[in-house]
Amino acid sequence: MSRIQTRFAALKREGRGALIPFIEAGDPDAETSQTLLHGLPAAGADLIEIGVPFTDPMADGPTIQRAGRRALEAGATLAKTLAMVETFRQQDKDTPIILMGYLNPIETYGHERFCVDAAAVGVDGLIIVDLPTEEADLILPFATANGLDVIRLVAPTTDDARLPHVLNGSSGFVYYVSITGITGTVTASAEQLAQNMPRLRRVTDLPVAIGFGIRNPAQAAEAVRQGDAAIVASALIDTLAETLDDGRATDRTVPAVLDQVRQLAEAVRSARLSARGA
């Protein structure tokens, strides 16, 4: 089994959902970003999503767009993101790492070369936001050949007829975009999640991770009651940004983000226990 499959299987045996925090590679600088990445597992991250900075992140809200700009201004690149994962793997062999980004940097790097190099440094999965379902074969054969899970995004607007087509070739988990629009804006209600989860379960056995709009422990807990994982991105980046001094990291930056991850992890770990006890 892949690291992603192994982690979700272990969590299923424990009867709990996963917390997947997001950080932007190189934000606000390479050293701080690396330190933060190393601290996430001990803070309660079950899997980690790393954003690859890009100049035109169309699905990202203002918070993550600003994070990307900070990272790019500090010299972040796709190659440096891979190096960041390689350094992480020297200390952590178990926590799954998913890269989330856009197709253009991968095309510039080279589809096959990217998949070979990503697997070699210890990346486990890919989320390519703007990869059309009809063009999945640009990446899928190379990813599969190198043991990388390709994680597809589905939304409330993805109709039942299209769902199997969108999920064809998907592995690892399904990223359920709980709202329509950009990241970090509004939040789906428990009722909306409850309506949409059953139709996903009918067409896939993959774990379902819920993202976009999850900002606090209560929302993360609700996500794992309805799905299998909560992805938290903009809220963590906001916390990071609040600690910066003129765009630069301070001694509060890493501790503040890790403290927030601990609070989210505690809520996620207790969510199903409290639901059973209710």
Curated annotation (Swiss-Prot):
Highest taxon in the source lineage: Bacteria
Broad EC category: lyase
Q: Which cellular component terms (GO) are annotated to the entry?
A: cytosol
Q: Which UniProt keywords apply?
A: Amino-acid biosynthesis, Aromatic amino acid biosynthesis, Lyase, Tryptophan biosynthesis
Q: Which Gene3D superfamilies match?
A: Aldolase class I
> Which residues are named in the active-site annotation?
E49, D60
Catalytic activity, EC = 4.2.1.20
Q: What does the record give as its pathway?
A: Amino-acid biosynthesis; L-tryptophan biosynthesis; L-tryptophan from chorismate: step 5/5
Q: Which reactions fall under this protein's catalytic activity?
A: (1S,2R)-1-C-(indol-3-yl)glycerol 3-phosphate + L-serine = D-glyceraldehyde 3-phosphate + L-tryptophan + H2O
The protein's matches in CDD domains, at most eight in alphabetical order, are given as:
Tryptophan_synthase_alpha
Cite a single GO MF annotation. tryptophan synthase activity
PROSITE patterns found in the cross-reference section:
TRP_SYNTHASE_ALPHA
Family of the protein in this entry:
Belongs to the TrpA family.
Q: Provide the function of this protein.
A: The alpha subunit is responsible for the aldol cleavage of indoleglycerol phosphate to indole and glyceraldehyde 3-phosphate.
What does the subunit comment say? Tetramer of two alpha and two beta chains.
What is the protein name stated in its UniProt record? Tryptophan synthase alpha chain
Gene of this entry: trpA
